[in-house]
Design a protein with these regions (language model features):
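Conserved SAM/SAH cofactor-binding pocket of Class I
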Residues: 12-97, 101-104, 110-118
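Conserved SAM-binding loop and adjacent beta-strand
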Residues: 1-16
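Short, structured loop/turn "capping" segments at alpha-beta junctions
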Residues: 110-113, 145, 170-172, 199
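Residue-level signal for inorganic ion chemistry
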Residues: 10, 105, 134, 192
């Protein structure tokens, strides 16, 4: 299975809900349902299934090849009974239930950066899932008390934050990701909800000066990498 750093970070970093309200009843994180939008190979869904041992995770993916790969990965995992792959467009998805947590590693290239590879464009380009529509759909699908977690490149993250605030979202947590201490931040991990809160501000360093993984990075991913 292809493993990307963005997905690894989001799957390990996102805060799991302690409880949400479904039909007037409090539901704990271990019995709630989570949604992975644009799941790709299914990495984030698998990580969430490991972290929340009884939660149900649904992954929705538009690309047929990626959906088949995710479905294969789900079947091969020990969490298969709690993972479901949905092939389709999130914008037309109308489930009966609402989700305690929605995660997404969304497309992020601007129009000017479109290439000739249609599948690559779809996977990594904002035209396939405009961020305003992602926010609107997440608001529709979240249970009361639920949250949206995602990862974006640093420049896009700032614009997204302004957009989210204008649409009535509140930042729960934000984490700037640095490849090295002497470099500008590459990514920002963010988690948002629909009620006011005091946001946590964090920073994460991936590599030490000698190129080895930082202790902070190892600690975050130690439950997923045997070598850590």
């Amino acid at each position: 299975m292809k493993v990307g750093t963005d997905g690894l970070l989001l799957g390990a970093w996102a805060s799991l809900p302690t409880y949400v309200s479904l039909n007037g009843c409090a539901v704990t994180k271990d019995s709630a349902a989570y949604l992975d939008i644009g799941s790709g190979s299914g990495l984030i869904s698998l990580m969430l299934a490991q972290r929340a041992p009884q939660a149900t995770i649904r992954a929705i993916e538009l690309d047929s090849d990626a959906a088949r790969q995710a479905e294969h990965n789900f079947r091969q995992s020990s969490f298969a009974s709690r993972l479901q792959l949905l092939k389709g467009d999130i914008l037309t998805y109308q489930p009966a239930e609402r989700y305690a947590l929605i995660v997404s590693n969304p497309p992020f290239f601007d129009n000017a950066l479109l290439g000739s590879n249609g599948k690559r464009n779809q996977a990594r380009h904002t035209a396939s899932l405009p961020l305003p529509l992602l926010l609107a759909k997440a608001a529709e699908l979240l249970a009361p008390g639920g949250s949206l977690a995602l990862v974006l490149p640093e420049p896009a993250a700032e614009a997204f934050s302004q957009l989210a605030g204008a649409q009535g979202w509140f930042a729960m947590a934000s984490c700037q990701v640095f490849s090295r201490a002497d470099k500008a931040p590459l990514r920002r991990l963010m988690q948002w909800q629909r009620v006011p809160c005091q946001p946590r501000q964090q920073q994460l360093l991936i590599h030490n000066d000698d190129g080895s993984y930082s202790e902070q990075y190892r600690h975050l991913l130690r439950d997923f990498y045997l070598k850590f």
